[in-house]
Structures are given as structure tokens and as C-alpha cells.
Amino acid sequence: MSVDIRPTPPAQDSARQNVTLQIVSVVMFTFIGYLTIGIPLAVLPGYVHDDLGYGSVLAGLVISLQYLATLLARPYAGRVIDGLGPKRAVLYGMAGSAASGLFMLLSVAIQGWPALSLASLLVGRLVLGAAESLVGSAAIGWGIGRVGAPHTAKVISWNGIASYGAIALGAPLGVLLVQWLGLWSMGASIVLLGALGFALAWPKLPAPLVHGERLPFHHVLGRVTPHGMGLALGAIGFGTIATFITLYYASRGWANAVLCLSAFGGCFIGARLLFANSINRLGGFRVAIICLGVESLGLLLLWSAPNPWVGLAGAALTGFGFSLVFPAFGVEAVNLVPASNRGAALGAYSLFVDLSLGITGPLVGFVANLFGFRSMFLFACLASLGGLALAVALHRRSRRPG
């Protein structure tokens, strides 16, 4: 007589809730870290252009410099995560976020000397970019260390919800803080958030260090490059909407472009909450193929939209499709390296989304100058289809024996 020892559905529900709580308790550091990124996002260009009196090029440089710093710091972040542990990396990142807030406070204090004020601001942006490279990847590594590798997709999905949600909340929060309290409140809030994150991380139990061979970063980068390229091609659609949707709507004489950003963000988060487990069931490549197909359809709707409501539907579909592209390719990428190199793999893989978002603005802007604003979304659709084709090729390669 056999005895069924499988857990009952309530026990399974309890186990799932426990895993989710453990993940959320760690990815909250990503939320705090990205909140420090979102708060100055909508304020700094105006501060540099209007208050310090510099041109639009420098105003844009202040924003993009942070992404460049994140890109360059990825290899170092991977070494810290793998060598010292994710908790230590989070602590370093939170300290860096607080330090960047101090540089922003200094910039406001010496506003009467525009060159010095700008220099202080630029240093702060570099420090914040380096801090971002530590916190985001470390939170994923910490979460996987706590709940186990089988839940990698769920950890990455929740981490993405935390990062995108924090930026969406931080940007309007920064505007309100400056309107109510003045420019100093922007730097002060970042200092306080960094200190809060440090204080919350300090007493938490670290994830156990995984011992083993540490591969050189360029070896890890070579292994994850095909997956990163698929991610980069998919991210062009997101970058195009985030950067140019307001100009596109204005060129068509349509109002309420901000609704597209809300629809994109809402569907992005909703899909991650509802379908994160599909990666474990179907595999990363299958999910990437489906998601990039949906994203391509959304971008095609934006390109061909006869009215703003079709454009809104296109933005929603694009957000829904892009939602699982990062974790879908990411799960397959992380599986290519030993567990002792997980941090390096996450850093190398994330580098591609930094690169994609960094070049999307000028590249898609060039396309718009040549062919008009509508053409941007056709270009992004073709890029997404390129990512889909790459996912199909990787899936076929993974099924070959040996």
C-alpha cells in the first residue's frame, strides 16, 4: 500500500507564499535603490538647463552619465557579488546611493558657481550609476541564494517589478518634493533612502557564498552574449516608448501621451505578477519567443495607429510582451555558468539592457529625423522580431544533443 506524501494544496500555497515573502524581503533593496534613481530623473535636466544655465546637451549628459557608469561598473559589481557576497554588495550600493545624494546637496549649495555645481552633480551621477550596478544584481543573487536556483525566474521577475515600480513612483515624487520643499530636498531624500537601505540590510542574514572557480569576466560575457543580444533587441521598444512617445503623440496632434506610459507600466507589472511561473513550466526560450511576438505586435500597432486609442493598445501590448523578456533570457543565461559565477553572469547579462537603453535615444532619434516619428516604432518592431529570431535559434541549439 502506497502512501501519498505530497503536500496538500494549502501547504503548497503556504510554501509559495513563504518563497514570495523571502524574495520581496530582498528585492525591496532594489526598490529603494531605484527610488534614488527615479527621484532626480525628471528634475535634473531642468536644473542643469534652467538654474545652472547650460545647454540641452549637458542636461542630457547628466542623465546618461549614470547609465554609462552603471555599464562600466558591471564587471566590478559581479566580482563583489561573487567574491564578497550579495549582502556586502547591497551595503556598498546603499552607501554609494547616500554619497551621491551628498554630492547633489553640495551641487545645490554651490549653485552660485555653475561650473563647480555641475562638476559636483556629475560626480554624484557617476557614484549613483556605480551603486545601481551593485544593488540590482546583488538583490537577485541574494534572493536566489535564499530561495534556491529553481526560483530564479521568480526572483528576477520580482526584482524587475521593484525597479520599474520605483522609477515610476520616484519621478513624480521628485517633482513634488522640489515643488514643495525646494531643490535641496532631492539630495536629502536620496541620502535618507540610502541610509535606510543600509540600516535594513545590515542585520539581515547573508546568502551563503558559493565556492568554486571564478571565471574571468570576459569569459562570462562571451557565454551570455547571445542571450544579452536578444534582451537588447527587445529593450529597444521600451526605450523608444519611454523616450519618444510624447513627441510621437504631439506630431499626430494627439493628447494624453502619458496614458501610454501608464498602460505600458501597468501591463508590464501585471504580466510579471501573473505569468512569472510560466518560465519554469515552458522554459526561458519559449517564453521569450511568445513575449517578443506580443511586443512586436504592440509596436506594429503603434506604428500603424489611426487614433490615440489604438496607440494606447499598442503601448499596453508592448509592455505586456516586454515584461518577461529579461527573466526569460536571464534564466537561460545564468544556467550557462557555475553557481560561483552567478553574480558575474547577472552583471554581464544586465550590461546589454544598459547598452540598449543608452543607444536607443540617439539611434531611434536618427531614424525619426530621416523617416518621421511613426518610423521609430516600425524600427523597434523589426528589432523585436530580430530578438524573436535569435530566441528561436537559441532554443533550437539548446535542444541539440551534446
Curated annotation (Swiss-Prot):
The keyword Transport applies. It is found in: Cell inner membrane. GO terms for molecular function: transmembrane transporter activity. It is a multi-pass membrane protein. InterPro entries: MFS, MFS_dom, MFS_trans_sf, MFS_Transporters, MFS_YhhS-like. Pfam families: MFS_1. Keywords: Cell inner membrane, Cell membrane, Membrane, Transmembrane, Transmembrane helix, Transport. PROSITE patterns: MFS. CDD domains: MFS_YfcJ_like. The chain crosses the membrane at residues 23-43, 52-72, 90-110, 121-141, 158-178, 180-200, 228-248, 255-275, 282-302, 309-329, 351-371, 375-395. GO terms for cellular component: plasma membrane. Belongs to the major facilitator superfamily. YhhS family. This is Uncharacterized MFS-type transporter PA1993. It comes from Pseudomonas aeruginosa (strain ATCC 15692 / DSM 22644 / CIP 104116 / JCM 14847 / LMG 12228 / 1C / PRS 101 / PAO1).
